[in-house]
Regions:
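A residue-level marker of the well-folded mature domains of exported/periplasmic proteins
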Residues: 28-360
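Bacterial N-terminal signal peptides that target proteins for export
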Residues: 2-12, 21
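Sec/Tat signal peptide C-region and signal peptidase I cleavage site
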Residues: 23-27
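Repetitive helical segments and hydrophobic/amphipathic motifs
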Residues: 16-17
Length: 360
């Protein structure tokens, strides 16, 4: 029998041990998870809530993952650059958190098929790209009910960002509630063409209040509209996070988004190799949307609002159940039918009762 020299045997054993250790270390490498944010993490609104979701994810999954984020990323070419750099830096899972990141995310996803991507509020998927949305329109409908009960001028204001389906359907949800609970109440809209610009947001809120609005909604990310409402002595409804502390004498409720559970579920599925592209919608039932109702709201009104929330959670009520007509009187959703997710995701019309026009 041929005998190998002791030194050669020891070298072979050491090499085997080294290879084993290398494989073990590789198998234990944490999953790299990246987040791309439209605004600053301190905006107290949309980006702030996504950052809270990232923190919840990091706390839950601990050493299994590492997380990082880039804030203040403009939609368009800048977003594409940041997303691509994350993919090049070997991030395994990338969340892109603004509607205008949709096409840049899709483009980069096609170039990096081994990276998993999830895009918030969009509607384009691919094998390695999923989408996720909050049914904020459910919260808007409840907010519309509160506005219907609390307004004295029958004029409600909306500080709007961009005329995209998400914003349009949220405005429509408020108008549908106003039509039902205080017919003849109108929504006045001011577009600021920005997600985060406290100066413009405050100016828009003040312009609405100057027109007689006594309940201010917003689809922007800073608390500036809330603060303007507080100063002017009118009511407001916060957005994305609970904004009550910015206007304790103004805020009736806030449409709060809790992204943590989805971030945890999606990341765990990547770790488990069970992730599949999907179009996820989370609402009141799932806890993705929450509505802390202020004590400014009378007890009887609060009780009725809580029943509306319960009905939405149970499926007994869907804000977009027909018959629903557009502002020109054309039927969009027939009696007994409910808008599909695809119809909600592409909504490009105002419902009956709206007097404003959608910018072209």
């Amino acid at each position: 029998m041929h005998k190998r020299p002791l030194k050669q045997l020891l070298c072979a054993v050491a090499a085997a041990i080294g290879l084993s250790a290398s494989l073990t270390a590789s198998a234990a490498d944490p999953l790299k998870v990246g987040f791309v944010y439209i605004g600053p993490i301190g905006d107290h609104g949309w980006t702030y809530q996504h950052e809270q979701g990232r923190k919840a994810l990091a706390e839950k999954l601990g050493e299994q993952i590492t997380t990082n984020y880039v804030e203040n990323v403009a939609e368009g070419a800048d977003a594409e650059r940041v997303i691509r750099n994350m993919a090049k830096d070997k991030y395994d899972l990338i969340f892109t958190t603004s509607f205008g990141y949709m096409n840049p995310t899709l483009k980069v996803a096609k170039q990096f098929p081994k990276v998993t991507f999830e895009h918030a509020t969009g509607y384009k998927q691919d094998k390695n790209l999923g989408t996720y949305l909050a049914r904020t329109y459910e919260g808007r409908y409840v907010g519309g009910f509160l506005a219907a009960k609390m307004t004295k001028t029958k004029k409600v204001g909306y500080v709007a960002s961009f005329p995209i389906p998400e914003v349009i359907r949220d405005i429509n949800a408020i108008q549908l509630a106003l039509n039902k609970y205080n017919p003849g109440t109108e929504i006045k809209v001011v577009w600021v063409n920005s997600w985060f610009d406290p100066g413009k947001e405050a100016d828009a809120a003040n312009a609405l209040i100057d027109q007689g609005v006594d309940v201010v909604f917003q689809h922007t990310d800073s608390p500036a509209p809330i603060q303007a409402a507080e100063r002017r002595g009118v009511y407001a409804v916060g957005y994305a996070s609970d904004m009550a502390h910015f206007g304790p004498k103004a805020v009736l409720t806030s449409i709060v988004n809790d992204w943590g559970p989805h971030y945890i579920q999606a990341t765990q599925s990547v770790l488990d190799h069970t992730w599949k592209s999907q179009d996820y919608w989370g609402g009141l039932k799932e806890g993705t949307v929450e509505l802390p109702i202020s004590d400014l709201v009378p007890v009887a009104v609060k009780t009725e609002a809580e029943q509306i929330i319960a009905d939405i959670k149970s499926g007994a009520l869907h804000p977009f159940t027909g018959p629903i007509k557009d502002q020109a009187g054309v039927e969009k959703i027939p009696a007994g039918a409910t808008a599909t997710n695809a119809e909600l995701a592409s909504m490009n019309f105002y419902v009956e009762g709206m007097k404003a026009e959608i910018p072209k």
